[in-house]
From Swiss-Prot:
The keyword Glycoprotein applies. It comes from Homo sapiens (Human). The chain crosses the membrane at residues 31-51, 65-85, 102-123, 144-164, 191-211, 270-290, 307-327. This is G-protein coupled receptor 161. One of its GO terms (molecular function) is G protein-coupled receptor activity. Glycans are attached at N4, N15. It is a multi-pass membrane protein.
Length: 529
């Protein structure tokens, strides 16, 4: 009996040791995971905040929302996540009741503000793409500030009720932090989900849905990479008659002009899917978990699922600087330039200022229905020349585009695509008669813009010459002929009282003749004399 009892005791002790060892391994793994998430959240959002703050030309109206988003995520990594790391090891809250309530409020406030900011960014892109002409009047600096203030007030309204009796705050050992007791007040759980999560998600769905529809209309393609243009004989019909069909074999040389690869539509679709997918993947499980706790009790959700859902909600703060910050080519180049100096390409200051001004109308997505010249004039800049970001395929590429959407415009150009835009190879395509009329009108507008630019250039040159002549005449009247630069007058005199420098006298005579001719508006006559 004693031998059997000792054997059973040894087995129980070994089982307890194995369980403790397994639990200790899980705790260590979870501790390492939450530390990695905290480091990525802190560093990722910090570099975007510093880049936007140091490079003031990047802080456009659209990027102000990104700045607010990344700054709030950085505060989350500093004020909330370190206490989550400590609680993941001890499995208890050791920082007191006051800080428990305050950390729960901070977590709800920052999370709600982040989700609402995503909705505001979607609205900003919606106006930039669908209404580019009225965008500068709709999205102004004051309205952007008002939108940011509204975001935080809206979030505060959704987070304060647990502190005033509607629901309560408690430490959740499986979430490793103090949160609202979702299982105690189903009404507050539903209110917070609708007020702070469902509302911005629906706004994102509607806005990005309209944006993608505009991209499809502008691209005039049904599927990415599988649509071809069929052009019949122009001699029989008298004009081009085009129709679309699905590419199957590609063997008919005269019928098919080639496959048009709608890279812009694919890019728009991928960007929208990434934005919406990141939101649903990171916040969807957490919303399902707290809804299950509110409806069927806290025991209805497994502890591991509760932990993973909380991790994913933290991971959303890692996705935001990647999607809305580092995906921006200009921000990425400036960040690399700050880290590695001149080893990476950085645009000159003047070019950056002009690019930021021209494309401030749509900092995320390039305009769809406007030519580069009209975009430049609408933004208050100069008409774009051959260095425009529109290539021969009609793709509008902007380095200031945060998500780098390239959307097809209604026209094509014979110029070579710029080196900084990666556009598909040049392919011929047929157009309808109505499209030809639109292209002719657009070409006429562009030619008028070029003529006006040449006129302005000539007027500027004439004004500069006139100003120099007036300045020279004023110097002659005030200081004499020696004050003019380039007049070679020697100090010695020759018999007769004149100066020995004939070159200087000839220069003065020619300058006076040129001055008189400029005042009379006839420069060529002065040169002939």
């Amino acid at each position: 009996m004693s031998l059997n009892s000792s054997l059973s005791c040894r087995k129980e002790l070994s089982n307890l040791t194995e369980e403790e060892g397994g639990e200790g391994g899980v705790i260590i793994t979870q501790f390492i995971a939450i530390i990695v998430i905290t480091i990525f959240v802190c560093l990722g959002n910090l570099v975007i905040v510093v880049t936007l703050y140091k490079k003031s030309y990047l802080l456009t109206l659209s990027n102000k929302f990104v700045f607010s988003l990344t700054l709030s995520n950085f505060l989350l990594s500093v004020l909330v996540l370190p206490f989550v790391v400590t609680s993941s090891i001890r499995r208890e809250w050791i920082f007191g009741v006051v800080w428990c309530n305050f950390s729960a409020l901070l977590y709800l406030l920052i999370s709600s503000a982040s989700m609402l900011t995503l909705g505001v960014i979607a609205i900003d892109r919606y106006y930039a793409v669908l209404y580019p002409m009225v965008y500068p009047m709709k999205i102004t600096g004051n309205r952007a500030v008002m939108a940011l203030v509204y975001i935080w007030l809206h979030s505060l309204i959704g987070c304060l009720p647990p502190l005033f009796g509607w629901s309560s705050v408690e430490f959740d050992e499986f979430k490793w932090m103090c949160v609202a007791a979702w299982h105690r007040e189903p009404g507050y759980t539903a209110f917070w989900q609708i007020w702070c999560a469902l509302f911005p998600f629906l706004v994102m769905l509607v806005c990005y849905g309209f944006i993608f529809r505009v991209a499809r209309v502008k691209a005039r393609k049904v599927h990415c990479g599988t649509v071809v243009i069929v052009e019949e004989d122009a001699q029989r019909t008298g004009r081009k008659n085009s129709s679309t069909s699905t590419s199957s074999s590609g063997s008919r040389r005269n019928a098919f002009q080639g496959v048009v690869y709608s890279a812009n539509q694919c890019k728009a679709l991928i960007t929208i899917l990434v934005v919406l997918g990141a939101f649903m993947v990171t916040w969807g499980p957490y919303m399902v978990v707290i809804a299950s706790e509110a409806l069927w009790g806290k025991s209805s959700v497994s502890p591991s699922l509760e932990t993973w859902a909380t991790w994913l909600s933290f991971a959303s703060a890692v996705c935001h600087p990647l999607i809305y910050g580092l995906w921006n080519k200009t921000v990425r180049k400036e960040l690399l330039g700050m880290c590695f100096g001149d080893r990476y390409y950085r645009e000159p200051f003047v070019q950056r200022q002009r690019t930021s001004r021209l494309f401030s109308i749509s900092n995320r997505i390039t305009d769809l229905g406007l030519s580069p010249h009209l975009t430049a004039l609408m933004a208050g800049g100069q008409p774009l020349g051959h260095s425009s970001s529109t290539g021969d395929t009609g793709f509008s590429c902007s380095q200031d585009s945060g998500t780098d959407m390239m959307l097809l415009e209604d026209y094509t150009s014979d110029d070579n695509p710029p080196s900084h835009c990666t556009c598909p190879p040049k392919r011929r395509s047929s157009v309808t008669f109505e499209d030809e009329v639109e292209q002719i009108k657009e070409a006429a507008k562009n030619s008028i813009l070029h003529v006006k630019a040449e006129v302005h250039k000539s007027l500027d040159s004439y004004a500069a010459s006139l100003a120099k002549a007036i300045e020279a005449e004023a110097k002659i009247n005030l200081f004499g002929e020696e004050a003019l630069p380039g007049v070679l007058v020697t100090a010695r005199t020759v018999p007769g009282g004149g100066f020995g420098g004939r070159r200087g006298s000839r220069t003065l005579v020619s300058q006076r003749l040129q001055l008189q001719s400029i005042e009379e508006g006839d420069v060529l006559a002065a040169e002939q004399r």
